[in-house]
Amino acid sequence: METLASALKSNPIVYVTRDIERALGLPLDTSGYFIISNSTSFAKRIANGRTNVLLIEETEVLDTREILENKLAQNFIKENSIKNILVFKNTSQIETICKKHDWKLLNPSAALANKVEEKISQIEWLGELTKYLPPHRIAICKEIKWDNLPFILQFNRAHTGQGTFFIQTETDLKLIQEKFPERPVRVTDYIKGPMFTNNNVVTKEKILIGNINYQITGLTPFTDQPFSTIGNDWSLPDKLLSPDQKKQYCDIATAVGLRLMASGWKGLFGIDVVLDEDTDKLYLIEINARQPASTTYESMLQEAKNKEQWNNGTMEPLTTFEAHLTALLDLDFDFDLITIDTGAQIILRVQPPVQSSE
């Protein structure tokens, strides 16, 4: 069975990303693994002059599409004979650029990712799996009536809590209706309770269920958005979820993963789940059809545990990011993910725009 390490040596990958931290799921000295990103003070410290990392110097931070169109990036890809391109979040524009240059884009199609992630098309895609969602309906914004119960209102496209609104009063509702009267929205019953998430991998053979973590959401001063995810804690689920609830969570993740597999998906996806504090039931809240933002840090935690177990002679196989690449390269897979039950991170989302170094 070909390992990821040997596959990368003969079939290298370049991760092209606006933010270099998205690409740090593998050690930077991994043979056959390249990164192209923006030149920031943080990126320079991380790259430390490595020849497999190209940092683009511009006055403003470039997005992934702009990096792919940059001549320095294109020359770097050509000089290193790289055919495989990996990005954080695929778009139709990125697909067009890769096709033009005869690069193989490893990410699943942008159209499929959008269908799965968008709040309205997701309902049709889920089919019978909508049983895992809280009570919900699709409506035109202006037609929604206030019935004295709080609810969640979502636009079709939302990311890290943007486009998601907690409607607590009739005034809250009217403010949105005045701005977006004709917009289709998803209306969902508000479920009060802690949020959980995890990172899973669809391989060609099975669904790998990742480590459940507590989702830190809407915490000031790290964000000014009440539903924005700003961190993760891998130790809390053992304290907050019973064994039966963990099984219920894994059943939801597996069902979503199998639906993704049937749709042609490969690689990472995440789910967000809420525990109803009144009924102890778990509800599916969101599907992230892409590499979730917590992947890099989780993989670092797994790598640290792996080194410890290697020294003890009990090494487990792959990190979440390694499994992601293994799946995207369509390699045979006979491993499980490294389990972790400790570690946490906080992300500052309210901050000035990042300027590229000069």
List each language-model region with its residue ranges.
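ATP-binding N-terminal substructure of ATP-dependent carboxylate-amine bond-forming enzymes
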Residues: M1-A111
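Short acidic-hydrophobic, aromatic-tinged amphipathic segments that line or gate anion-handling sites
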Residues: V53-R65, L133-C141, F165-Q168
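A conserved helix-loop-beta module that forms one wall/lid of the active-site cleft
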Residues: K99-F165
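Conserved ATP-binding module of the ATP-grasp superfamily
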Residues: Y132-P134, I152, T164-T197, T223, ...
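Phosphate-binding site of ATP-dependent enzymes
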Residues: Q168-D224, L275-Y283, D341, Q345-V354
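ATP-dependent carboxylate/phosphate-activation module, predominantly the ATP-grasp catalytic core
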Residues: K192, N200-V256, N288-A323
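A long amphipathic alpha-helix within ATP-dependent nucleotide-binding catalytic cores
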Residues: S228-T279, L328-V350
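C-terminal structural cap/anchor segments
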Residues: D278-E358
